[in-house]
A protein has these predicted regions:
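N-terminal targeting or regulatory segments adjacent to alpha/beta-hydrolase or S9 domains
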Residues: 2-115
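Non-catalytic accessory segments flanking enzyme active sites
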Residues: 66-137, 142, 337, 346-349, ...
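Glycine-rich "HGGG/HGxG" loop immediately N-terminal to the catalytic nucleophile
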Residues: 109-111, 174, 187-201, 235
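Short beta-strand element of the alpha/beta-hydrolase
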Residues: 143-151
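Conserved hydrolase catalytic core segment
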Residues: 165, 169-172, 219-269
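Conserved alpha/beta-hydrolase
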Residues: 166-192
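Conserved acidic catalytic loop of the alpha/beta-hydrolase fold
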Residues: 204-222
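C-terminal subdomain of alpha/beta-hydrolase-fold enzymes, centered on the catalytic histidine
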Residues: 283, 290, 298-443
Length: 443
């Protein structure tokens, strides 16, 4: 795609993007011939990735977009405050106002943009949709290719802290033989990837697209990893068992047995005979289903209706995103980290297109073993359980769900956004989980 001059008016720029079918409010430009220092250190020559089907990408949002964002923030009409002293009604007014004050005055998107542009990024078109991805080749020989998928309300930003530990383990206390070549795509409808104009982009379709992506990059043996939506997408890849895929690692497994899933959906008490760990998981899942899954219901049934407000008000969208990290992401992430993610959604106008993955998934559970058809997975599966996850998957359930479970570990800190919150810990477990597969030949 040709570069667009940032001197054009914001209105003209939007019209140009709409006519070209581009994705949201981003500016694309091919990188200069000279790589950044980071690119030189972390990846092989661009020619190893760039082909006729794979184009270099750099983000450069027009100044007008950032001016417009601050104008909208300044014009916010705030609601009244909550009538309780806790988070039971959602994000507290004072908390959000503090975040938004920073967003509208001191937050610097250009810093976030530079962080992305320090890494090799590309665009390729698969099944008519542009797929944006980061591709970092390890400096270590015999690195194992790994495709890693984000979730909602996350983005590629949630995975960036793992790039160093996974591609250059010796700089982070690891061994050279544990190195990965890392591919981090943006899910269709998210970030800089294209927004599908038709239906059918469910996790199975995305999984097939990821297989095409790895083939297009020349990888004949590789592994996959994911949490949140990255988990069912990686699980779908394992069910499809394409030639070259050696195994998967999940930090949000679909371990919930059918009888547990059924009891939760029906509002029944816990089945008899559960262990302490199983009963604890049941109670957490039951509470989440009753009080924490409202976002899934609305996005799974009416994403378009929801999107009108979220696409028009940055503060409304920020509140929606903020709420789904327990309403307190500041305990594990900095303000800048929270806002990097929120601002990426805003600038690419992907509130609706990202929500649509829930509709495409027919509002199905991503934690149910039967719904996710884990019985069809014969490839090796590694699982890491984080204590702050939506539920702590018991080993007994996970062994039952995945017949070829080769690695299971419970760690002592971290939550749903494991790669963001505990990148070193997750990276160490990804290394350990895939270590037995490194010398394995693909099917």
């Amino acid at each position: 795609m040709s570069a667009v001059s940032s001197s054009r008016t914001w209105r003209t720029f939007l019209a140009t993007l709409a006519a070209a079918g581009a994705f949201g409010l981003v500016l694309l430009a091919a990188p200069s011939d000279a790589q950044t220092a980071t690119e030189k250190e972390t990846t092989a020559a661009p020619s190893e990735t760039t082909t006729a089907a794979v184009r270099p990408f750099r983000a450069n949002v027009p100044d007008e977009a950032l001016v417009d964002l601050r104008r909208r923030i300044k014009a916010t009409r705030w609601p009244g405050g909550e009538t309780v002293g806790d988070l039971s009604q959602g994000v507290q007014l004072a908390t959000l106002q503090e975040l938004v004050r920073y967003w509208g005055t001191d937050y610097d998107w250009r810093r976030a943009e530079a962080k992305l542009n320090a890494l090799p990024q590309y665009i390729t078109t698969i099944d008519g949709v542009d797929i944006h991805f980061i591709h970092v080749r390890s400096r270590h020989p015999n690195a194992l290719p790994l495709i890693m998928t984000h979730g909602w309300p996350g983005s590629i930003f949630e995975l960036l802290k793992t790039v160093g530990p996974l591609t250059d383990p010796t700089s982070y206390g690891g061994r050279p033989e544990d190195a990965f070549d890392l591919v981090i795509p943006s899910i269709p409808g998210f970030g800089f990837s294209g927004q599908p104009t038709g239906t059918g982009w469910d996790p199975d379709h995305i999984a097939r697209a990821w297989v095409q992506l790895m083939m297009r990059l020349g990888y004949t043996r590789y592994v996959a990893q994911g949490g949140d939506w990255g988990a069912p997408i990686s699980g779908a890849m394992a069910r499809q068992a394409p030639a070259g895929l050696l195994g998967i690692h999940l930090n949000y497994p679909a371990s919930v047995p059918p009888e547990i899933d059924r009891a939760i959906r029906n509002g029944d008490p816990a089945p008899a005979g559960l262990s302490a760990a199983e009963n604890a998981a049941f109670e957490v899942l039951k509470n989440f289903s009753a009080k924490g899954a409202g976002y899934r219901a609305i996005m799974g049934t009416r994403p378009q209706t929801l999107g009108y407000g979220l696409a028009d008000s940055p503060v409304a969208f920020a509140a929606f995103i903020y709420d789904y990290n327990g309403g307190e992401p500041q305990h594990s992430l900095t303000k800048d980290e929270v806002l990097d993610n929120v601002t990426l959604y805003w600038l690419t106008n992907t509130a609706v297109s990202s929500a649509r993955i829930y509709w495409e998934n027919d509002n199905k559970s991503n934690t149910s073993a039967s719904v996710q058809k884990t019985e069809e997975i014969s490839l090796p599966v590694a699982v890491t359980v984080f204590p702050g996850e939506i539920y702590r998957a018991p080993k007994s359930w996970t062994q039952r769900a995945y017949r070829n479970l080769v690695y299971f570990n419970e760690v002592d800190k971290g939550g749903h956004f494991a790669a963001w919150e505990q990148p070193q810990l997750l990276s160490e477990d990804v290394r350990a989980g895939f270590r037995p597969l490194r010398n394995q030949r693909s099917s």
